[in-house]
């Protein structure tokens, strides 16, 4: 039995799906920038922070070995990255605001390791959890359990 989602749950789930897509796009964009730089012999440590710092440094220097076209493309990709960050932050803020007003989210966030995003995603997916007889049922539903529930 799967409970019908409330309109609020559906809205929250949509926010999570959109945020997840934006995060995937940002990761792909960062990897694309990394690839462009690597093709030109410029290596950057893994992670968004080193890449952002390297991109700012590269674009702030006078033209060097990078062609004007690549500099322009890198600048445009940097702008795309900023727009994605802005949208991700806006949706994350909205999710956080909704989670602060939800008692189920607040309860879940008392569990060590569960933050706003995880708690609100769980509430969006399963509501208050009353549809499960025991914790194992939830684990089986979320595919986090290695043994099937009989």
Kindly give the residue locations of the regions a language model identified.
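Phosphate-backbone recognition surface of nucleic-acid-processing proteins
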Residues: 107-150
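A polyampholytic, Gly/Pro-enriched intrinsically disordered region
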Residues: 1-2
């Amino acid at each position: 039995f799967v409970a019908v989602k409330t309109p609020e749950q559906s809205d929250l789930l949509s926010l999570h799906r959109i945020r997840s897509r934006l995060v995937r796009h940002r990761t792909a964009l960062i990897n694309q920038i990394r690839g462009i730089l690597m093709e030109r012999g410029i290596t950057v440590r893994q992670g968004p922070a080193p890449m952002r710092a390297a991109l700012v440094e590269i674009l702030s220097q006078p033209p060097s070995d990078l062609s004007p076209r690549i500099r322009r493309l890198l600048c445009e990709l940097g702008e795309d990255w900023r727009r994605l960050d802005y949208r991700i932050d806006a949706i994350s803020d909205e999710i956080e605001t909704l989670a602060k007003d939800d008692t189920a989210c607040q309860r879940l966030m008392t569990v060590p390791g569960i933050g706003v995003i995880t708690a609100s995603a769980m509430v969006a997916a399963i509501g208050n959890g009353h549809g499960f007889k025991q914790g194992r049922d939830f684990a089986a539903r979320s595919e986090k359990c290695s043994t099937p529930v009989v």
